[in-house]
Regions:
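Surface-exposed, low-hydrophobicity beta-strand/loop segments enriched in small/polar/acidic residues
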Residues: 1-213
């Protein structure tokens, strides 16, 4: 595992897989010891970007990564497929329970995902899932899904209490865990980090989000 600088942005149009593209404008306070997280099943070359929402239980303890996933294309209540674009280098796994978080922090219509099918060509980086009709109700293109606490539950598995300070690159097939320092107070470029629902941002009031566009 390697730590790189305060970097990384990935979107449909731009990728800087090992860049020095800055995301942090100012870091006032961080848990420098950070926490560790499991790399079980994580492929070599995976990048966990700076600015990823995380939850740290204690200094030097365990950090929970809170990846988000963007819906690609509108999804009707009768749809039986769902296409997602991972926002943080974390591919949604089979059985992962996700749902859309409302502005009130409610995760409506959470359900488990099936086996991901990687798309190719112009759709590379996106994954298609088979779903049961009305699993997620209706979703709009660009909606952000978060990990939910349980199928049918009305809340997220966890809320962030900070953002990752630097990007982490998995550079070995034998790595068992990674570590991340967590920023709790600072200023960050919100359009260079993984998209997240507004309720996530409200959960970390020490972070000020600035936008370029």
């Amino acid at each position: 595992m390697s730590n790189y600088g305060n970097a990384f942005f990935s979107s449909e149009s731009k990728q800087y897989p090992a860049s020095v593209m800055p995301v942090w404008l100012e870091v006032k306070r961080r848990k420098i010891a950070g926490g560790t997280f499991s790399l079980s099943g994580v492929a070599k070359g995976t990048i966990f970007p700076a600015g990823l929402p995380v939850r740290l239980d204690k200094m030097g303890g365990t950090v929970t990564l809170l990846p988000t996933f963007t819906v690609v294309g509108a999804v009707s209540s009768s749809a039986t497929t769902l296409v997602l674009r991972p926002q943080a280098g974390i591919i949604p796994a089979e059985g992962m329970i996700v749902g859309k978080m409302t502005s009130a922090g409610v995760v409506a219509k959470a359900a488990a995902l099936g086996t991901p099918t990687a798309l190719s060509g112009s759709d590379a980086g996106k994954y298609q899932f088979t779903i049961t009709a009305n699993d997620f109700g209706t979703l709009a293109d660009g909606d952000i899904l978060v990990i939910a606490s349980a199928a049918g539950a009305n809340k997220a598995a966890a809320l962030p209490n900070g953002l990752s300070w630097r990007q982490v690159v998995v550079d070995s097939d034998n790595a068992t865990y990674g570590s991340i320092a967590v920023v709790t107070d600072g200023q960050i470029l919100g359009d260079r980090i993984p998209a997240m629902p507004d309720f996530y941002k409200e959960a970390i009031p020490g972070i000020e989000f600035e936008y370029e566009l």
